[in-house]
Amino acid sequence: MKSLLLLAFFLSFFFGSLLARHLPTSSHPSHHHVGMTGALKRQRRRPDTVQVAGSRLPDCSHACGSCSPCRLVMVSFVCASVEEAETCPMAYKCMCNNKSYPVP
């Protein structure tokens, strides 16, 4: 009987704390409503800059040392078959005055 009471107390405490985390506890409903409209406006606002999904190209700004202009060049691979063409790896190197430098 004692263990049953302890279990009931624990479960009520556990679920009570779970609900307290997810339910808003505002004493003024109008303040909660204003906050929600502000949050919705922020979600609907378009970003100032466009973000592209995926990884970025390597940066060659410091790869060539004092040589300039240091620019990024894509190294091409010849794939063995047409089926492998979609998964053919892409590699980059930094070039300055016909000399190649490794990408940092």
Swiss-Prot record:
<feature type="disulfide bond">
    <location>
        <begin position="67"/>
        <end position="96"/>
    </location>
</feature>
<keyword id="KW-0732">Signal</keyword>
<dbReference type="Pfam" id="PF17181">
    <property type="entry name" value="EPF"/>
</dbReference>
<keyword id="KW-0217">Developmental protein</keyword>
<dbReference type="InterPro" id="IPR039455">
    <property type="entry name" value="EPFL"/>
</dbReference>
<feature type="disulfide bond">
    <location>
        <begin position="79"/>
        <end position="88"/>
    </location>
</feature>
<keyword id="KW-1015">Disulfide bond</keyword>
<feature type="glycosylation site" description="N-linked (GlcNAc...) asparagine">
    <location>
        <position position="98"/>
    </location>
</feature>
<comment type="subunit">
    <text>Interacts with ERECTA and ERL1, but not with TMM.</text>
</comment>
<feature type="signal peptide">
    <location>
        <begin position="1"/>
        <end position="20"/>
    </location>
</feature>
<feature type="disulfide bond">
    <location>
        <begin position="64"/>
        <end position="70"/>
    </location>
</feature>
<dbReference type="GO" id="GO:0010374">
    <property type="term" value="P:stomatal complex development"/>
</dbReference>
<dbReference type="GO" id="GO:2000122">
    <property type="term" value="P:negative regulation of stomatal complex development"/>
</dbReference>
<comment type="similarity">
    <text>Belongs to the plant cysteine rich small secretory peptide family. Epidermal patterning factor subfamily.</text>
</comment>
<keyword id="KW-0325">Glycoprotein</keyword>
<feature type="disulfide bond">
    <location>
        <begin position="60"/>
        <end position="94"/>
    </location>
</feature>
<keyword id="KW-0964">Secreted</keyword>
<dbReference type="GO" id="GO:0010375">
    <property type="term" value="P:stomatal complex patterning"/>
</dbReference>
<dbReference type="GO" id="GO:0005576">
    <property type="term" value="C:extracellular region"/>
</dbReference>
<comment type="function">
    <text>Controls stomatal patterning. Regulates asymmetric cell division during guard cell differentiation. Mediates stomatal development inhibition. Not cleaved by the protease CRSP (AC Q9LNU1). MEPF1: mobile signal controlling stomatal development in a non-cell-autonomous manner. Uses ERL1 as major receptor. May act by competing with somatogen (AC Q9SV72) for the same receptor, TMM (AC Q9SSD1).</text>
</comment>
<protein>
    <recommendedName>
        <fullName>Protein EPIDERMAL PATTERNING FACTOR 1</fullName>
    </recommendedName>
</protein>
